[in-house]
A protein has these predicted regions:
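Catalytic core and acceptor-binding pocket of nucleotide-sugar-dependent glycosyltransferases
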Residues: 45-142
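Conserved hydrolase catalytic core segment
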Residues: 5
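Conserved donor-nucleotide/metal-binding helix-loop-beta segment in metal-dependent transferases, i.e.
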Residues: 8-45
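Short aromatic/hydrophobic "clamp" motif used to bind/position activated sugar donors
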Residues: 1-2
């Protein structure tokens, strides 16, 4: 399922590759931050922006198979999500990522995610014009 919020667009259809379909979740990479996108085990997560993301049926079915916590009072939820908002991408890709992985879900590595979607300038997407963008255009299209 291709999720596209109202501030995201397909900008480079020729950048599509079936490699994207090898993963159950792929979205624009997040910038590395010392104090953000940290899963409950202390690992920094870099892939997960949901504004424009590709999600498999397997991933979407996980909440039908296991209980996925959705509780802001559990641990330091906001630190894990880097936001005071209740965003599903932080839940799926940071806070509860391990539960999805236990069900066999695969997340794209940063290098593949950078070819899929752009949200902000990062070393991994320098010089790339990805398939889609979320929120701001890649430099090659400005």
């Amino acid at each position: 399922m291709l999720i596209i919020q109202d501030h995201g667009f397909v900008v480079n259809p020729s950048a599509w590759t079936d490699e994207f379909l090898e993963y159950d979740y792929i979205g624009a990479p997040w910038a590395w931050s010392e104090n953000a996108y940290i899963d409950p085990f202390g690992n920094h997560q870099r892939v997960g922006n949901g504004g424009v993301s590709l999600r498999s049926k397997k991933l979407m079915d996980v909440p039908n198979k296991v209980v996925i916590p959705w509780d802001v009072n559990q641990g330091d939820f906001y630190k894990h999500m880097n936001a005071g908002l209740f965003n599903e991408d932080g839940n799926i890709c940071v806070h509860n990522k391990h539960l999805y992985e236990e069900q066999g879900c695969k997340y794209a590595p940063v290098e593949v995610a950078a070819k899929f979607s752009y949200e902000r300038d990062l070393p991994e997407n320098k010089g790339l014009t990805p398939f889609v963008f979320h929120y701001s255009l890649p430099p090659s299209l400005r």
